[in-house]
Swiss-Prot record:
GO terms for cellular component: cytosolic small ribosomal subunit. It comes from the Eukaryota. The lineage of its organism: Eukaryota, Fungi, Dikarya, Ascomycota, Saccharomycotina. Its main location: cytoplasm. GO terms for molecular function: rRNA binding; structural constituent of ribosome. InterPro entries: Ribosomal_uS4, Ribosomal_uS4_CS, Ribosomal_uS4_euk/arc, Ribosomal_uS4_N, S4_RNA-bd, S4_RNA-bd_sf. Component of the small ribosomal subunit. Mature ribosomes consist of a small (40S) and a large (60S) subunit. The 40S subunit contains about 32 different proteins and 1 molecule of RNA (18S). The 60S subunit contains 45 different proteins and 3 molecules of RNA (25S, 5.8S and 5S). This is Small ribosomal subunit protein uS4. The keyword Ribonucleoprotein applies. Keywords: Cytoplasm, Ribonucleoprotein, Ribosomal protein, RNA-binding, rRNA-binding. Belongs to the universal ribosomal protein uS4 family.
Amino acid sequence: MPRAPRTYSKTYSVPKRPYESARLDAELKLAGEYGLKNKREIYRIGFQLSKIRRAARDLLTRDEKDPKRLFEGNALIRRLVRIGVLSEDKMKLDYVLALKPEDFLERRLQTQVFKLGLARSIHHARVLITQRHIAVGKQIVNIPSFTVRLDSQKHIDFAHNSPYGGGRAGRVKRKNQGKGGEEGAEEEE
């Protein structure tokens, strides 16, 4: 089977100044609050946000009735509403400029699994996802940074073949059940 072509464009951009204590503290707080693996995950969200804000700024410079502003602006807003970053009552380009990285971090699968109570902590949520215990709809998703759409949010649950979702029990549990069955048979004799 042929492999998919690689994209060589960067998905994140690092800060120009590496040691700013205020920024470092803010990043550490975000990484802890949302259970991120490294700073690159924060930089990736910031990069996405900067591209979205750049597009919004470009569209805001155009005339109100400009067809490009109307078409592309509505498409941008609709996309942000669909993933749940922008609320229905704030469907204007001005509100797009007010978006923060936290809005995008809230929509990650890892955060949603924790908020739904499927995991004991944000870190446990990441482990459950990478170990393929979580499904969105019928599709198992093992990427913690997966952006959950609003309509998919209600379909997040344990995978049907996961021990948590009523599937086959794990190795240790099966072993312990086997021991329990053998002890019961010996007592009967």
